[in-house]
């Protein structure tokens, strides 16, 4: 009996010890600490109401999350004094928000700026209190450096490795300037001289002596962080340059149309440089101009809907994905050329002018029209899209996908099942069409797509406009979307349930017969 009592006592002691250990090592914030715990419902509103937030996405069972917790609690207490909240999201209990934030490892720390929930920056520094607090304080307080005199500016210019932006006395711009500085603190240095009588906004590039002044209406920037950001990103780019890989992302992030000149030799590049530099200067802030070596980047022209015939000039609007180019030769004629055919300079200038005026005609890419449809998911191509989606009698559901997109691949079998279910019911077969289009192989000018897969429903009727599906891509939600948004209000879920009840009944009958045998 004594042994039993000791044994039980040991077990109880062990359990108590284990409980205290687990409590000590819990990844969740200690009640009463400055480390806040958020849920999916509160996440969006919290981020949108704070200019700077550090968020930990964690899993309760994760040892690394448990180790990080005390460091975050200390950091939260320090950062609270600087009005920078530190919060937690438990990914086990809030899986949807973690999925939306593409959280793949635990713990993941993300920095959210200016209330944007889908633009979080992953913190890649050391995950200890001092490093975290130092980084966040510097990000918040040093995003704009306030100076008292012109003499204090010079050291920043002499030692600059990043573009230096200077706000001289434009106090009305302060709030917008601070917001943009917070966003771009890792790419620019922002200085502010509040008492200056100069009243100007300028940017100094490293290793240059002449500043670039903002020569527009400053009032157009006040309260308009997008416009200020756009100016900063565009003005640092040359009028025309032979592109380097590390510079290309800056052109992409400017969101301006990109004009490409593919050259075949250094002599050819030199011959056209003055023309394109002048065009770049005349169209600053409207079109960016770059050169590409056709030997190094021959296949890039495929993304411009053009053939590999060099030299070549084309314009790509990356917002709506429309492409414009000079006329090209038939393949047979191009193959007979003994040397590159020069581009017509007047035609280059005219294409740029027509593009700016909105009269240039885009190059439309389309697969060939299928001779037969091989499944219940109807294949649409660029040439047939508009005729098919605007149907007097049918609701038309269209999936715009990309072959390289993992989300498109995951959704494909679900979409196929939706089509099969609706095709199984004769009463709705003529009232709805389930279709898809490969956006990488077909240009749809009437409906530019920027994310994949995009699901849109065109209700029956000639003048119907697409209704975008924005819920979880599963069977139930898509059926509900069709029912609520379509002209015919087809209840796909009811058809699905009826179909599976019939199958279950067949299986039950077969089992009964088998048992009787």
From Swiss-Prot:
Keywords per UniProt: Endoplasmic reticulum, Glycoprotein, Isomerase, Redox-active center, Repeat, Signal
List of glycosylated residues: 159, 174, 207, 293, 462
Signal peptide extent: 1-29
Subcellular location: Endoplasmic reticulum lumen
One Pfam match: Thioredoxin
InterPro entries: Prot_disulphide_isomerase, Thioredoxin-like_sf, Thioredoxin_domain
Residue interval(s) of motif Prevents secretion from ER: 514-517
CDD domains reported for this sequence: PDI_a_family, PDI_a_PDI_a'_C, PDI_b'_family, PDI_b_family
GO BP terms: protein folding; response to endoplasmic reticulum stress
UniProt xrefs under NCBIfam families: ER_PDI_fam
Role, per record: Probably interacts with nascent polypeptides in the endoplasmic reticulum. It is an essential gene only in the absence of PDI. Its native disulfide isomerase activity is very low.
Subunit record text: Interacts with EPS1.
Similarity field: Belongs to the protein disulfide isomerase family.
The protein's name: Protein disulfide-isomerase EUG1
Organism listed in the record: Saccharomyces cerevisiae (strain ATCC 204508 / S288c)
